[in-house]
A protein has these predicted regions:
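Ligand-binding pocket segment of bilobal, Venus flytrap-like solute-binding proteins
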Residues: 159-231
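A bilobed periplasmic-binding-protein/Venus flytrap-type ligand-binding module shared by bacterial periplasmic
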Residues: 113-118, 236-251, 267-271
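Periplasmic solute-binding protein
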Residues: 86-96, 104-125, 149, 153-163, ...
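Periplasmic-binding protein-like
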Residues: 140-148, 258-282
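A structural signal for short loop-to-beta-strand junctions that line the ligand-binding cleft
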Residues: 76-81, 96-116, 130-132, 140-147
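Short, low-complexity disordered leader/linker segments with a strong preference
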Residues: 1-28
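Early extracytoplasmic/lumenal segment of secretory-pathway proteins
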Residues: 18-91, 199
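Short beta-strand->loop
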Residues: 99-105, 131, 205, 218-234, ...
Length: 320
């Protein structure tokens, strides 16, 4: 009887071991940052056209996402990644987590947003530039994101390095810290929890976000509650790619092609408030007023992969 039980158990284990291979032929898995959004219609369109079931895993901000993929690169958790950006791409390249090349899928300009109503009610002049945020008038009014885990946070850190130089950028951060800046772990926490302009419940009227974010805050009167500071922003490019050792490379190829298609890219502005890379994709008309691209950008041409750890160490010495 014990022998029979052992044989049955072995058979069950054998069948269980075969299951993932069977699933790989019918399912493709996408891992993305928490801000990734896709409509039910797009999911249905992809599944019908490709024949693959789509599974989505969300893995935090771009920094957390990239770090998790590095830790699991020998046994990847997905077939395709969406959301590694130009601030964390160096980590992906250094660790060989991508099969082939990362392909640009969208872009957005990292810049500060402020709550117009908050400033109007208090008759306070809002900042004209992120350089103003160290002034006493804006004490304890600003929330940024951690450059160790957040791609907008690392983007803004690079912006300050580009603006002040390797030897002087720390002084800006010391002054910002002394002026009561709040540091959130990621963009979603900063924007939806701490920023007053997104929900009305946050305690900070200035937040590190994107030039397109005010388009998400249009009120019934046709005006946006928020505005963006459009000078000296950081152009953040997000990428999509097939993970090395992906279980379903055929499905991965189909999914990457779909994410770059005109059909899916048309949905990106309204769902994720980013600019699509497909030139045929349609940009919402209201974006020209409420979500324009930055007037000027700075920092994205730096060698972030080479200097990232040194900058982060200097930043951590101020905030830890």
């Amino acid at each position: 009887m014990k022998k029979l039980v052992s044989l049955l158990a072995g058979s069950i284990l054998l069948l269980a071991g075969c299951a993932p291979a069977d699933q790989a032929a019918t399912k493709v898995t996408l891992v993305a940052h928490d801000s990734f959004a896709i409509s039910d219609e797009s999911i249905a369109e992809f599944q019908e056209a490709s024949g693959f079931e789509l599974e989505i895993i969300r893995a935090g901000d771009a920094g957390s996402l990239t770090n998790r993929l590095v830790l699991t690169k020998d046994s990847p958790i997905a077939d395709v990644v969406f959301g590694i950006d130009n601030t964390f791409r160096g980590i992906a390249d250094e660790n060989g987590i991508i099969d082939g090349d990362l392909v640009p899928v969208d872009f957005a300009d990292v810049c500060f947003n402020y709550d117009r109503l908050w400033f109007e009610k208090r008759s306070i002049t809002p900042p004209a530039s992120w350089r103003d945020l160290t002034k006493p008038a804006y004490n304890s009014l600003t929330v940024v994101t951690n450059p160790l885990s957040s791609s907008p946070g690392l983007a803004f850190l690079a912006t300050t390095v580009a603006a002040f130089g390797e030897q002087s950028f720390e002084q800006y951060w010391k002054e910002l810290s002394d002026n009561g800046v709040m540091v959130a772990a990621g963009w979603e926490e900063a924007y939806f929890t701490h920023f007053s302009g997104s929900s009305g419940n946050g305690e900070y009227p200035i937040v590190l976000s994107y030039s397109s974010s005010p388009a998400a805050e249009i009120r019934e009167d046709g005006k946006s509650q928020t505005a963006a500071l459009l000078d000296e922003c950081f152009r953040q490019t997000e990428f999509v790619g097939t993970l090395a050792l992906a279980e379903n490379p055929e499905g991965a190829k189909a999914l990457v092609e779909f994410l770059l298609s005109e059909s899916f890219q048309n949905t990106m502005p309204s769902l994720m408030y980013v600019y699509p890379v497909n030139e045929k994709a349609v940009i919402p008309a209201e974006w020209s007023e409420f979500g324009p691209a930055a007037r000027s950008t700075i920092g994205e041409d730096l060698s972030i992969a080479t200097h990232r750890e040194k900058w982060q160490t200097k930043w951590s010495a101020i905030f830890d």
